[in-house]
């Protein structure tokens, strides 16, 4: 809306311009970008020479890491003193799971399990619940969601749940699944335990989010969904090759959608113009940034993300009650109006 009204300001003022502006609105940014892929493949128009997406933060995002989702596959059969029936967590690969639930049977009483559970949740400062349902037990852990590009800002409910369950005598596929989640993925945001950690001087370090967990003992294809934000210097196949070395993983597959690393140099006129306007209007020093998140800015060779979140703003993106202050939208609209005019005058 801030960009829309910025264009309206330019139009209503009758300012002279020398370039055309294309206002492209996408609605699938969180679910694969199928709309943009279709649009650019079928619109019959030359791609814009440059552009920006108002889907990030100021002062600018002129670099975005690569983005690939890879799936670890596991068997399901397990029988023993402890048997894992189901384990589920997460809604999307690009979100830290806020809650996780497992159903299992155990050669223990509810009281015995609750004693261990109380000690674990107290030590980890977790909100959680353990109840008995017939012959089985249901355990739920509540964490904190966060954007998949910054998993360290969240609390992954799935890995904490696995950490609790991994102390018990599960066997077979359940043991492998819980071991992987609790001992390989837990708190490993850089992929060090996976053997895929990598850092580039310009784009920074690889990050990993374990986003979706699906396990059913009656299924022979259970999965853990891992989302990687990777810098230039590594790639999806290199990551896959390392994941295939994990003990007990039956297969590793890749998502159909991948974004390779994207970078527009700081001395590009687009970047320098946007930063100049930002500095003029805010009085703050502009600087380039590379992020693990993905924006529509990367759809253009000379595309960046520009706003609309300000540096002093509390980031609630992908969290409950996500919001933006109206006053900040006004501030952003003013910046966009001047920036757009400088680019098209």
Can you name each region flagged by the protein language model?
Residues 1-77, 114, 190-202:
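Acidic/histidine-rich catalytic neighborhood of metal-dependent amide-processing enzymes
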Residues 18-22, 127, 285-287:
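Residues at or immediately flanking beta-strands
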Residues 26, 103-107, 227-229:
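Short hydrophobic/aromatic beta-strand micro-patches
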Residues 27-31, 144, 294-296:
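Short, internal active-site loops enriched in acidic
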Residues 35, 97, 316-320:
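Short acidic, glycine/proline-rich loop/turn micro-motifs
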Residues 57-59, 88-92, 214, 291-295:
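Short, solvent-exposed loop/turn elements at beta->coil junctions and helix N-caps
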Residues 62-88, 93-144, 148-208, 235-250:
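Acidic-enriched catalytic cores of C-N bond-cleaving enzymes acting on peptides and small amides
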Residues 149-220, 225, 229-244, 250-345:
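An extended, acidic, His-containing surface patch that forms the Zn2+-binding/catalytic region
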């Amino acid at each position: 809306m801030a960009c829309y009204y910025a264009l309206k300001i330019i139009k209503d003022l009758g300012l002279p311009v020398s370039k055309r502006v294309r206002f492209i609105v996408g609605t699938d940014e969180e679910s694969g970008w199928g709309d943009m892929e279709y649009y650019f493949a079928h619109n019959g128009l030359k791609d814009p020479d440059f552009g920006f997406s108002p889907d990030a933060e100021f002062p600018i995002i002129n670099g975005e890491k690569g983005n690939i989702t890879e799936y670890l596959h596991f068997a399901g059969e397990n029988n023993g003193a402890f048997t894992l029936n189901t384990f589920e967590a997460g809604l999307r690969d690009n979100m830290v799971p806020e809650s996780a639930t497992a159903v299992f049977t155990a050669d223990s009483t509810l009281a015995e399990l609750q004693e261990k559970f109380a000690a674990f949740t107290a030590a980890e400062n977790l909100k959680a619940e353990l109840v008995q349902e017939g012959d089985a037990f249901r355990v739920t852990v509540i964490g904190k969601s966060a954007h998949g590009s910054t998993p360290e800002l969240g609390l992954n409910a799935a890995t904490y749940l696995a950490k609790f369950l991994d102390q018990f005598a599960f066997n077979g596929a359940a043991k492998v699944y819980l071991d992987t989640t609790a001992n390989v993925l837990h708190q490993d945001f850089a992929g060090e335990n996976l053997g895929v950690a990598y850092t580039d001087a310009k784009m920074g370090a690889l990050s990993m989010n374990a986003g979706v967990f699906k396990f059913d003992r009656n299924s022979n294809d259970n999965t853990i969904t891992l989302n990687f934000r990777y810098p230039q210097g590594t790639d999806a196949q290199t990551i896959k090759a390392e994941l295939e070395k994990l003990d007990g993983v039956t297969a590793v597959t890749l998502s159909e959608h991948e974004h390779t690393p994207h970078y527009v140099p700081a001395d590009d006129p687009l970047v320098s113009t946007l930063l100049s306007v930002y500095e003029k209007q805010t009085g703050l020093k502009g600087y380039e940034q590379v992020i693990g998140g993905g924006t529509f800015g990367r759809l253009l060779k000379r595309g960046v993300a520009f706003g609309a979140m300000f540096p002093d703003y509390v980031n609630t993106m992908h969290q409950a009650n996500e919001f933006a202050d109206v006053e900040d939208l006004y501030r952003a609209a003013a910046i966009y109006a001047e920036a757009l005019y400088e680019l098209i005058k």
